[in-house]
Structure formats: C-alpha cells, structure tokens
C-alpha cells in the first residue's frame, strides 16, 4: 500500500505541475507556455543584471525625460517582459474598455478595429503601426481592413515573435514588421496612407519627436490615430497618493514621465497635424478597462507560483521572478489609477496631415 500511495502521490504532483504549466500557463491566444519563458534577446545568465540596471534607471522617471538612453532601456524592458506578457495577457499589449457580454479577447479586437475604422483606409492601402509589439493589433487590423500593415518595434525579439504569429495566422502577406526606433524610422517621406499607435508613444521621451516622424512618413491628407497614456484632469501633482500611483505606473512600464491629457493635441498641432477628434475612451459610458486586472489577481498569484518554481529548477532565467513581481505591483498601480480616474491608457486623438504644407 505504501508503494501504491507513493506512486499515486507522485502522479498527482506530476499532474498538478502539468496543469499549472501547460493548461493554465498559455496566454489566451496560446502564444506562449510558462516553460518557454525567457529574457527575449538577453541571454539567460544576464537577465538578472539587466533587470537591476533597468530598475535603477527608471527609479525617478520624471528626471530622465531627455535621457538618450531611454530607447535602449525600453528595448531592455521588452526583452524582459515580452514572454510574460504573451503568457499571462495575450498578444495585444494594451488595454480596452470592458464590453458586457463580450470576452476580453473580443473587447480587445473591437478596440483595435475601431482604430483602423477611424483612419478610413481601403483594402490594399499601406498603413503604419508605430510601436507594434508582437503584432496582436496588427493582425486584427489587417484581417478587418485588408490593408497592408507595416509595424515597427525597437525590440528585435518582438520582431521575431510578430513574424512567427503573422505566419501562423496566415496574415504574413498583409503584415510586415521591421526593427527600428520610431523616433527615427527607416521609411521615406509620404509613404503611408494612414497610421495608428496603440498605447506605444508613451515610451517616447518627447511626444513631439515621435509625432514628427509619423507626420513625415504619412501621405498628405491621410489620418493618424493614437491611444495615449495620460494623466487626466483629476490628477493633482500636490497629492502624494496621486504621485505615488503615477510614478508606480511609470517605473513598471518603462515610461520617461507620463504626459497630461492637455498636452496631446497641443503637440499634434505643433508638428503640423490638424486635430479631427479627441476623446478619452476610458470615460463613461465606457465600462472600466481595469476590471480585467482586478479579476485576474488569482491568475497573477498562480502565475507567480509557476515562475518561482521554474526559476528555482533552472527552467526560467534568474531574474524572472523579479520581473514578474514588478509587473504584479504595476498592475496594482494601474488599477488604482483607473479607479481614482487620474490615469487613462486610451486617450484617443485623431489627426490629419494637411493636403498642403502650412506656409
């Protein structure tokens, strides 16, 4: 009986480990398994050191707004978090309003399709995805619009992941991905029939620089839409709790200082855009975008147990636990930012590049 009990116990443990890692582990689109977690383009033995360097650099986000090293550390950030994002969140690295009766996956797709509907592109036209990540939005937008989408991301590992997903989805004929800095894009002037950026330009040290580049590569008369991360009119810089929440979001998301909602249209006009529409998509009647974060707390704890185990046995690189812990804390700051109304990740601005350059 002792032998039978031992085998049964071993079987139950093996089954539990398999369930944790292989059943609960994959992200909603099954792009990653927990056992595949890595440091992106960073070798496993350097993940811990790179995390420490990242965390030290972003301790005081407001003091690094003009730092030349920001793009390099944004690249480091996405090497550290891309696998965890895919595994625990999905292939679309952004938020969306909760839609009653719809799954998180469907709500995400609706949010993405709205972006391309706003810029009114036709099948076959060329559009830019500025800050494309692993291409979740790109694939949804290409499938919906039949436009030719070119995405740019600063992270080479994300380029590899995006191309893999594009091919698996049968959308590689519509989706192209290049590695580059959206502050200095490798595209000619007047290349694209439209452009969008979904929660990505927040990584730019200066919004004017990335908006100028997007303006440059767009054709005259074309439209650009962006979902911006901003502090709202409710934010008070003299409120210590407000400051703590915003700094927590900045540190945990590689942001060189969040911008005020009031700065977005001003910057767009400064680089030459005509502002067609501006709206905070997080405001009522939209349902709370942070519900998914709150409802996923059990999953976060489960995932953290998985990460600790995998790190302990050498499957996941050292430092992965630190990265996951950082993201868990950041999720709490994001939730507090949403609940208090001082932060929005979806301040939408729709702009047009004039047919003729202003005199």
UniProtKB/Swiss-Prot annotation:
Family annotation (InterPro entries): Methyltransf_11 (IPR013216), MeTrfase_SMT (IPR030384), SAM-dependent_MTases_sf (IPR029063), Sterol_MeTrfase_C (IPR013705)
Pathway recorded for this protein: Steroid biosynthesis; sterol biosynthesis
Catalytic activity, EC: 2.1.1.143
Keyword hit for Lipid biosynthesis: yes
Keywords per UniProt: Lipid biosynthesis, Lipid metabolism, Membrane, Methyltransferase, S-adenosyl-L-methionine, Steroid biosynthesis, Steroid metabolism, Sterol biosynthesis, Sterol metabolism, Transferase, Transmembrane, Transmembrane helix
Primary localisation category: membrane
Membrane topology: Single-pass membrane protein
Catalyzed reaction equations: 24-methylidenelophenol + S-adenosyl-L-methionine = (Z)-24-ethylidenelophenol + S-adenosyl-L-homocysteine + H(+)
Annotated compartments: Membrane
Residues spanning the signal sequence: none
GO cellular component, one term: membrane
GO molecular function: 24-methylenesterol C-methyltransferase activity; sterol 24-C-methyltransferase activity
TM region positions: 4-24
GO biological process, one term: methylation
Top-level class of the enzyme under EC nomenclature: transferase
Free-text function comment from the UniProt entry: Catalyzes the methyl transfer from S-adenosyl-methionine to the methylene group of 24-methylene lophenol to form 24-ethylidene lophenol.
Family: Belongs to the class I-like SAM-binding methyltransferase superfamily. Erg6/SMT family.
Name of the protein in its database record: 24-methylenesterol C-methyltransferase 3
Organism lineage string: Eukaryota, Viridiplantae, Streptophyta, Embryophyta, Tracheophyta
């Amino acid at each position: 009986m002792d032998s039978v009990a031992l085998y049964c116990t071993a079987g139950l443990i093996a089954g539990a480990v398999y369930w944790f890692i292989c059943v609960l582990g994959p992200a909603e689109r099954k792009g990653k398994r927990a056992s595949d977690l890595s440091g992106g383009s960073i070798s496993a033995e350097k993940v811990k050191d790179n995390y420490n360097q990242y965390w030290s650099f972003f301790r005081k986000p407001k003091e690094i707004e003009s730092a030349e090293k920001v793009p390099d550390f944004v690249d480091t950030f996405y090497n550290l978090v891309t696998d965890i994002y895919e595994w625990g969140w999905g292939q679309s690295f952004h938020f969306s309003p909760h839609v009653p009766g719809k799954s998180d996956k469907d709500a995400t797709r609706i949010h993405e399709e709205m972006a391309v509907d706003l810029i009114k592109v036709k099948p076959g036209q060329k559009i830019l995805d500025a800050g494309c990540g692993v291409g979740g939005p790109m694939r949804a937008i290409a499938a919906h619009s039949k436009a030719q989408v070119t995405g740019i991301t600063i992270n080479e590992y994300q380029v590899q992941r995006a191309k893999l997903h594009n091919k698996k989805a049968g959308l590689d004929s519509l989706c192209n991905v290049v590695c580059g800095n959206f502050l200095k894009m490798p595209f000619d002037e007047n290349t694209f029939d439209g452009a969008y950026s979904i929660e990505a330009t927040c990584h730019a040290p200066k919004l004017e620089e990335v908006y100028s580049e997007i303006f440059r590569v767009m054709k005259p008369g074309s439209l650009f839409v962006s979902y911006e991360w901003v502090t709202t009119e409710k934010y008070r810089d003299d409120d210590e709790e407000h400051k703590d929440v915003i700094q927590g979001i900045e540190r945990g998301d590689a942001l060189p200082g969040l911008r005020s909602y009031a700065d977005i249209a001003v910057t767009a006009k400064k680089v030459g855009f005509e502002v067609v529409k501006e709206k905070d998509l997080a405001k009522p009647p939209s349902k709370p975008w942070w519900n998914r974060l709150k409802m996923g707390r059990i999953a976060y704890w489960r995932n953290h147990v998985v990460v600790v185990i995998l790190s302990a046995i050498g499957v996941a690189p050292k430092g992965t636990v630190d990265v996951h812990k950082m993201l868990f804390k950041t999720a709490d700051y994001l939730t507090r930012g949403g609940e208090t109304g001082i932060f929005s990740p979806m301040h939408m601005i729709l702009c047009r590049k004039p047919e003729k350059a202003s005199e």
